[in-house]
């Protein structure tokens, strides 16, 4: 569930209908509003409160401050968080103009200061983060233990999309997709299916 104005009760009904994932928590997601003077929680609160929801988190150091990353970690725990880049074409590229979505009908976005912006320069348009940046932010800024941040980037997403029988861990019989990095989380080697690419 995500890109949603759902109220809390709708989000709970979504669980009953089989929803298990909240897409990029805090981004394009309903939260507390006032209705006739009463506070009404939204999808955000349902995703944090209900264990049935795993949550995707764009931990790029831009979408969410370290304090919110810590709050998510405290409320969901390591096993219910999946780090996602939400990256678009400008990921890993220099500042400039890129298209979000279709090459023929995509939305023009501007990449600067480590984030993709809508033309108004205010709203974010996805992310330009890479996976190593997310691990770095979670460990260095939010203080999450490295092994837990790596689980959030590997086994947790694999489990949520139903491919944990082949991806997400290092073990006999698993796909040998590996990234080796140093203490600064700078990538040193990349292996896909056991073959070194970098």
Where are these regions (language model features)?
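Short, Lys/Arg- and Gly-enriched loop/turn segments at beta-strand edges
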Residues: 184-191
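Short beta->alpha connector loops
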Residues: 2-7, 61-64, 185
